[in-house]
């Protein structure tokens, strides 16, 4: 099976926070952050697999510190764990106060993509960690994959009991 270094999938994007990006608390709107996370993660997944990829799940997003208008936001994404056709992408969000020069981890996210060929799941290369950060993410990946598998089963079970009736006609 083909293997690739995690760094080969790395995608980085830096943006500036503008007034129209802010919520009523004068911090970056969470939906804007999630859209950027999904976008940068999709690049890492496609770069790793060299195939069309679809977002299977946003597994966890932890908003650690607020992001303000004086900040720039750097998104770093790379594939940190793989299954047969799935890829777990880690996204690290770093905010930098452009006036003070202070940097901080503002958010982290694990997001799963599935590689497709002719509309069907297709195999992906395994990943090779090099740095301490990559080794930790890779080593803990199987635990997160198992948790996702259990959660997906529960979601399917829940979908069976959810109603499709129109709430306005009850």
Residue ranges and their predicted role:
Residues 18-19, 64:
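Residue-level recognition of the GNAT/N-acetyltransferase active site
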Residues 7, 11, 68-69, 80-170:
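HotDog/MaoC-like acyl-thioester-processing domains
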Residues 12, 27-42:
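Compositionally biased, charged N-terminal/linker segments
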Residues 3-8, 28, 42-81, 85-88, ...:
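Hydrophobic beta-strand-centered segment that forms part of the acyl-chain substrate-binding groove
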Residues 21-34, 167-170:
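A conserved, well-ordered hydrophobic junction motif at loop->secondary-structure transitions
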């Amino acid at each position: 099976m083909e293997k690739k270094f995690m760094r080969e999938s790395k995608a980085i994007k830096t943006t500036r926070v503008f007034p129209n990006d802010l919520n009523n608390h004068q911090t970056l709107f969470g939906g804007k952050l999630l859209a950027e996370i999904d976008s940068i993660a999709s690049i890492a997944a496609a770069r790793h697999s060299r195939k069309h990829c679809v977002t299977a799940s946003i597994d966890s997003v932890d908003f650690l510190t607020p992001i303000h208008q004086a900040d720039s936001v750097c998104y770093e994404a790379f594939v940190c764990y793989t299954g047969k056709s799935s890829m777990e992408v880690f996204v690290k969000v770093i905010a930098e106060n452009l006036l003070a020069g202070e940097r901080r981890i503002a958010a982290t996210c694990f997001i799963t993509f599935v590689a497709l060929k002719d509309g069907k799941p297709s195999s992906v290369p395994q990943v090779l960690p090099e740095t301490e950060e990559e080794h930790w993410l890779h080593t803990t990946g199987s635990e997160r994959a198992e948790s996702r598998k259990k959660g997906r089963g529960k979601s399917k079970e829940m979908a069976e009991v959810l109603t499709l009736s129109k709430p306005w006609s009850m």
